[in-house]
């Protein structure tokens, strides 16, 4: 049975696999980010969104996996076997949890549509031969205008849409030849 955890979010496991392995942040950094940004939503009783639920499940899976590794490390005497098991877990299950947390945190931060566009454009870039690629890779770095920004100790603040500042008006030189001459000044 082929279960794709990203299908209900309009993405796929294949799209996430186009991203290089070193693209995803360390697992501890992702866990810290998730708990810092969404601790209330993750520990609360209310259902916030499917992304919050997916993050909650990924954190529970990683906790259980960490307990299993700790138990195995305590009960295995061979240092080499212990190292191989930890490396295997980090390279397989750890990577899946990192991908999962990154995807759902990015969807909450940037919006699901933006993340999907990024994954597709990155996938197209990777499949395009190097001589035909545009010079810059797709970047997922700008916050959309509807992003919710939380400040410590305060309620949610919704960011207002960005407005263009008016361009400064040019001042004309006040040199003598440009000053408007009034008829009375000619006398």
Swiss-Prot record:
Motif Bipartite nuclear localization signal in this chain: 163-180
GO biological process, one term: viral penetration into host nucleus
InterPro entries from the UniProt entry: Hepatitis_core, Viral_capsid_core_dom_sf_HBV
Sequence segments annotated as region (3 X 5 AA repeats of S-P-R-R-R): 160-179
Biased composition regions of type Basic residues, renumbered to the chain: 151-180
Segments for region (Disordered): 151-187
One GO CC annotation: host cell
Swiss-Prot/TrEMBL Sequence repeat ranges: 160-164, 167-171, 175-179
Superkingdom to which the source organism belongs: Viruses
Region called RNA binding, residue ranges: 181-187
Residue stretches in coiled coil: none
Positions where Phosphoserine occurs in the chain: 160, 167, 175
Free-text description of this protein's post-translational modifications in UniProt: Phosphorylated by host SRPK1, SRPK2, and maybe protein kinase C or GAPDH. Phosphorylation is critical for pregenomic RNA packaging. Protein kinase C phosphorylation is stimulated by HBx protein and may play a role in transport of the viral genome to the nucleus at the late step during the viral replication cycle.
Localization annotation: Virion; Host cytoplasm
Gene Ontology MF term list: DNA binding; RNA binding; structural molecule activity
Function text: Self assembles to form an icosahedral capsid. Most capsids appear to be large particles with an icosahedral symmetry of T=4 and consist of 240 copies of capsid protein, though a fraction forms smaller T=3 particles consisting of 180 capsid proteins. Entering capsids are transported along microtubules to the nucleus. Phosphorylation of the capsid is thought to induce exposure of nuclear localization signal in the C-terminal portion of the capsid protein that allows binding to the nuclear pore complex via the importin (karyopherin-) alpha and beta.
Family: Belongs to the orthohepadnavirus core antigen family.
UniProt protein name: Capsid protein
Organism: Arctic squirrel hepatitis virus
Lineage, opening ranks: Viruses, Riboviria, Pararnavirae, Artverviricota, Revtraviricetes
């Amino acid at each position: 049975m082929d279960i794709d955890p990203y299908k209900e979010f309009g993405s796929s496991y294949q799209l996430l696999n186009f991203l290089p392995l070193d693209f995803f942040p360390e697992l501890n950094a992702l866990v810290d980010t998730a708990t810092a940004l969404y601790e209330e939503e993750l520990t609360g009783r209310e259902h916030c969104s499917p992304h919050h639920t997916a993050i909650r499940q990924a954190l529970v899976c990683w906790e259980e996996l960490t307990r299993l590794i700790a138990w195995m490390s305590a009960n295995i005497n061979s240092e080499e076997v212990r190292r191989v098991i930890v490396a295997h877990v980090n390279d397989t299950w750890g990577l899946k949890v990192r991908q999962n947390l990154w995807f759902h945190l990015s969807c909450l931060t940037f919006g699901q549509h933006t993340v999907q566009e990024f994954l597709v454009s990155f996938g197209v870039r990777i499949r395009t031969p190097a001589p035909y690629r545009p010079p810059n890779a797709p970047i997922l770095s700008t916050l959309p205008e509807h992003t919710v920004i939380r400040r410590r100790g305060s309620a949610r603040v919704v960011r207002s849409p960005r407005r263009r500042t008016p361009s400064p008006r040019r001042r004309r030189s006040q040199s003598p030849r440009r000053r408007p001459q009034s008829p009375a000044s000619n006398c």
